[in-house]
């Protein structure tokens, strides 16, 4: 059983909504490219800004054509068939041009894709034809990039391994960053276990503009019967001296003094941002890696939900602080379904 504190609506009403990508098609029945930019923090209205970019589009393979052996076959355009949808995160850079120039440069990219495997399935991206607006990101684009397949492809099993695959960019998600950075809580701090402590987790409830059931993301019904999605992130631990009694009121007072502000961004798809505008204890500040603004990309928190809703409208409807006893340090974490060193199973 856990105790819950609900944050007031003003803590997320200013930047807690993301508008949908307009899915329109042209005369050729292809999707019309579009760029969507949201602001997190207080970025400058004009001039140089820091932009985080996520390219969205389709994986395509050449269409199969009958081999007739005629001369016209050498010049005939075969076309492409869509075999899946996905994304390419290219990170943060300084940018001073217009949004439309950036969109044009992104859709002009020639991106080849390969499906492979390491410890898990991966997608390899190789990029060519990098235009001038994308030069701030060129260092990363020219090197080639590898991502966890389940984070960047909606259905990686649909990507063939025996055919050439290209990634055609159609949409661009951009997050314009101000004072709020995209600092993440290091995994070692997020997994920290302290005796005699209370874990402060955030339960974030979302409303989306699409139906998610058919894609494997089941909503929950709220008290009014509306369908909502939710996810949880870990903020930190509250620790008291030995012998001191924890109370819900004590935990609530600690959270209220932080004066947290929440917002949504487009980093990795959909991202949840937390900014501390009030007072913060040294213990809690250390757990946040001495940052007063942190980012939780849904791509890392709940990859499948992120894949389903990253082009839809998304709105924060509630944020709750959930106070739970910290997981004891002697509890063992099992990241793999195969247990080590049991019976005939041995670690290599």
Swiss-Prot record:
Plays a crucial role in virion assembly and budding. Forms a shell at the inner face of the plasma membrane and concentrates the HN and F glycoproteins. Acts as a negative regulator for transcription and replication by sticking to the nucleocapsid. This effect might be regulated by the cytoplasmic interaction with tubulin that dissociates the M protein from the nucleocapsid. Homomultimer. Binds to the cytoplasmic regions of F and HN proteins. Interacts with nucleocapsid. Interacts with human alpha-tubulin and beta-tubulin. Interacts with host ANP32B. InterPro entries: Matrix_C, Matrix_N, Matrix_Paramyxo_C, Matrix_Paramyxo_N. Pfam families: Matrix_Paramyxo_C (PF23765), Matrix_Paramyxo_N (PF00661). It is found in: Virion; Host cytoplasm; Host cell membrane. It comes from Sendai virus (strain Ohita). GO terms for biological process: viral budding from plasma membrane; viral budding via host ESCRT complex. This is Matrix protein. It is a peripheral membrane protein. The gene is M. Signal peptide: none annotated. Belongs to the morbillivirus/respirovirus/rubulavirus M protein family. The keyword Phosphoprotein applies. The keyword Zinc does not apply. A large portion is phosphorylated in the cytoplasm, but not in virion. However, this phosphorylation is not essential for virus replication.
